[in-house]
Amino acid sequence: MTALFTPFTLKDVTLRNRIAVPPMCQYSARDGYVTEWHRPHYVGLARGGAGLVIVEATAVSPEGRITPGCTGLWEDGQIEGMAAIACGIKAAGAVPGIQIGHAGRKASANRPWEGDDHIETGMAGGWETISPSAIAFGAALPKVPREMTRDDIDRVKADFVSAAIRARQAGFEWLELHS
């Protein structure tokens, strides 16, 4: 038997095998809340035999979303839907994981099938982007973000802590930070 199909333990978390489903954005949330799409999608992946299923990039704040369709854990109301996903993944035999992050200068973008470019701040669905420096991501995402202040940095740091706590409350056993 190859190592791929053997259990793997990291600290107090044991995976049934070494197959992990990485976080892949679904862009199907509403205002940061998971929808009817999410639970069957992730539970189905767990039923497929993976040892670890990591839920998509989940924003720590509304302005930290990549698109308006991204999931979030910036408020307590978002825990319930995420808990149903974590519980379903665990019931299917996999370890529930989640990736939390802040999109920075790549935020406020359209979903890939809607153009994958920035949504301007004043347009419907768009918001102000912030980043450590006022430098655009590149030609595909040319919007120049507002340079973060020290207060912004402290707030985003606190947002990561709060989202991690909510992820734990929702039942996730594996946390991945995207920065």
Predicted regions and their residues:
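N-terminal binding-site loop/beta-alpha segment at the start of enzyme catalytic domains
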Residues: 10-11, 17-36
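Short beta-strand segments
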Residues: 22, 99-101, 176-178
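Non-globular sequence segments
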Residues: 87, 95, 101-168
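Acidic/aromatic-lined carbohydrate-recognition and catalytic surfaces
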Residues: 18, 55-115, 150-151, 155
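Conserved, mostly hydrophobic/aromatic
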Residues: 21, 45, 49, 89, ...
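N-terminal amphipathic alpha-helix/helix-capping segment at the start of soluble metabolic enzymes
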Residues: 1-20, 89
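Short, acidic/polar
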Residues: 33-45, 155-165
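Catalytic domains of carbohydrate-active enzymes, especially glycoside hydrolases
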Residues: 39-61, 170-174
